[in-house]
From Swiss-Prot:
Enzyme class per UniProt: translocase
Subunit note: NDH-1 is composed of 14 different subunits. Subunits NuoB, C, D, E, F, and G constitute the peripheral sector of the complex.
InterPro entries for this protein: NADH_DH_suC, NADH_quin_OxRdtase_su_C/D-like, NADH_UbQ_OxRdtase_30kDa_su, NADH_UbQ_OxRdtase_CS
Biological classification of the source: Bacteria, Pseudomonadati, Pseudomonadota, Gammaproteobacteria, Chromatiales
Species annotation: Thioalkalivibrio sulfidiphilus (strain HL-EbGR7)
Localization (cell): Cell inner membrane
PROSITE patterns (UniProt xref): COMPLEX1_30K
GO CC terms of this entry: plasma membrane
Record protein name field: NADH-quinone oxidoreductase subunit C
UniProt keywords, alphabetically: Cell inner membrane, Cell membrane, Membrane, NAD, Quinone, Translocase, Transport, Ubiquinone
Coarse class of the protein's main subcellular location: membrane
UniProt-listed Gene3D superfamilies: NADH:ubiquinone oxidoreductase, 30kDa subunit (3.30.460.80)
């Protein structure tokens, strides 16, 4: 960690430790995790006292199946990865099928705020976990950073996270008749319904999805020297 980051981390720890704040460093970036109850005061302090004038991004996170992978390997070969992959993630199920929910540790939903200090030329990530998994809610920061308006609407639309005090919390990406929140891990990857144009009714209609979910494994074919079979290399050497 650079000297500038060390100084910022020390300031953040000193300022927010009493309120339950925790500072972590990874990949040259700092993350400040604060309790939901202290988020509003923390956001105002970051803007007014530490110079983070700008919110450049905000997103929701669903940790329901964090770390669960359907295919993983530490080895590869010129034969490619195995194509026989078992479905593992919670969202990969057929329409109307009840999937088994996997247990997870810690809070399920979090909101991540990416902050920029123009005056100090520094960036900071603030993370807040929702206390209630069934009804995830945090306070809005639109009164701290006005740019949070549409970001919070997007997180509400895709993850179902409520932002208490938001002036106009409604869907922004999906249509008004959409059911559910598509970025949640328990939302089926194939969706609930599909649309098609019905020429007899002369309008768009909804119907149950006809797509069968399957696990896709990338298959990469390269012809450079790193992936040529040993036998081919031997023939080339003999020529």
């Amino acid at each position: 960690m650079s000297e500038r980051l060390e100084k910022l981390a020390a300031r953040l720890t000193e300022r927010f430790k009493a309120a339950g704040g925790k500072v972590d460093s990874a990949y040259g970036e700092l993350t400040l995790t604060v309790p939901a109850a202290a988020m509003t005061d923390t956001a105002k302090a970051l803007r007014d006292d530490l110079g983070f004038e700008m919110l450049i991004d905000l997103c929701g996170v669903d940790y329901q199946e964090y770390g669960v992978a359907e295919w993983s390997t530490e080895e590869s070969s010129n034969q490619g990865f195995s194509r026989g992959v078992e479905k593992a993630t919670f969202g990969r199920f057929i329409f109307d099928e009840v999937a088994e929910r996997k247990a997870h540790e810690g809070p399920r939903f979090a909101v991540v705020y990416h902050l920029l200090s123009i005056s100090a030329n520094q960036r900071l990530r603030m993370k807040v976990f929702c206390e209630d998994e069934e009804f995830p809610v945090v306070s809005t920061v639109t009164d701290v950073w006005t740019s949070a308006d549409w970001y919070e609407r997007e997180a509400f639309d895709l993850f179902g996270i409520m932002f208490e005090g938001h002036p106009d919390l409604r869907r922004i990406l999906t249509d008004y008749g959409f059911v559910g929140h598509p970025f949640r891990k328990d939302f089926p990857l194939v969706g609930h319904v599909e649309m098609r144009y019905d020429p007899e009714q002369a309008r768009v209609v909804y119907q149950p999805v006809s797509i069968e979910p399957r696990v896709l494994v990338p298959k990469v074919i390269r012809q450079d020297h790193r992936y040529v079979h040993e036998s081919a290399q031997e023939k080339s050497a003999d020529a």
